[in-house]
Amino acid sequence: MVELGRWGCAAFVAPWLAAAAQAEAPRAVVQNTPDMTFSGSARIPACVVSAVVDGDPAKGASLAAVRASAACSIPWHWHTANERLVMVTGNAQVQMKDGKAQQLSPGGFSLMPSKHVHRFTCTTKCMLYVLLDAPFDLHYVDAQGGEISAEQALKGVAKKPKKPK
């Protein structure tokens, strides 16, 4: 064990204290799913809707509740933020580029580091929470890893599956 002493300890902790001071003060949130307002986005398949629970995805870290219908898939993509997701209901598959698809069931967790290419499919109707540590962005990629438009990426997705309720 390394002895830091009073000043060594202060030097060790100072960067975290500075970051915490700059972060937005947390607020209390207690919310049930029926009270959330879900909506879709042109950049995401029509079978996915989300509701911001905390934060502002346009400006920084955020938490969103996400619902999707069975067989709903978000094609290969990446985010600038680190993405954490927790399954609440239903089952899904998460596949990292060059990896095998992994099954997620209620209570399951996945972490996709910044710019890590992945795809996500709800194999049954599902709900999950997604936590991002930076503003939300979505970069779709083709089979070779080159960035493509949302329109190109979503052409291969089933046409307007029934929206989840």
Predicted regions and their residues:
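Hydrophobic h-region of N-terminal signal peptides that target proteins for export
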Residues: 11-21
